[in-house]
Amino acid sequence: MDLLATGRIRGTFGIEGFVKVESFSGEYEHFLGFDRVFLSILKEKLREQKYKDGWFEIEEVNLRKADALVKFKGIDNPEAAKCLTGSELFIPRDKAAPLDEGEVYVHDLCNCNLVCEGTLVGKITSVAEGGGGYLLEIAGKTSEAAAESSFYVPFNKEFIGKIDLKAKTVELMHRWILE
């Protein structure tokens, strides 16, 4: 099953075990169609109990302006809900929010090659949240003389050009950002 990261649990809400979920796409309507999700981070206490496989059934979803409140079956108090904070929610790709022209799922950028002027710069290993937006974590070299390392490139139209998911390439527009 092809899973796609769709959001992250930011914290707890109330006394009944609800969690606040931030959508990676900024869209929340599709959360209403979820009956279960896979959570990426499980605290050992929960892993030892009934959630060994990582799948959680959803009891209720309430949409708000900047997040969604989600209630999972069996998570009935703030202490249990707190154990889920930081987890990413994964869903089957066919349940994800539809993309508009030119949009990509951030998760799909991982393992793409970052190229600048036809030269391989490195491989995108993850996507992190920064204060001004997403940052692509790259494993590669910032110059010919540099040792291989990890570095970050802002994921915005000023620095990122063509994205070809079939070819697994992302174009870096300006080499000077690596200096």
Swiss-Prot record:
GO biological process: ribosomal small subunit biogenesis; rRNA processing
Pfam families from the UniProt entry: PRC_RimM, RimM
Annotated GO CC locations: cytoplasm; ribosome
Localization: Cytoplasm
GO MF entries: ribosome binding
SUPFAM superfamilies: PRC-barrel domain (SSF50346), Translation proteins (SSF50447)
Ranges where the PRC barrel domain occurs: 101-179
Function in brief: An accessory protein needed during the final step in the assembly of 30S ribosomal subunit, possibly for assembly of the head region. Essential for efficient processing of 16S rRNA. May be needed both before and after RbfA during the maturation of 16S rRNA. It has affinity for free ribosomal 30S subunits but not for 70S ribosomes.
Recorded family membership: Belongs to the RimM family.
Protein name stated in the entry: Ribosome maturation factor RimM
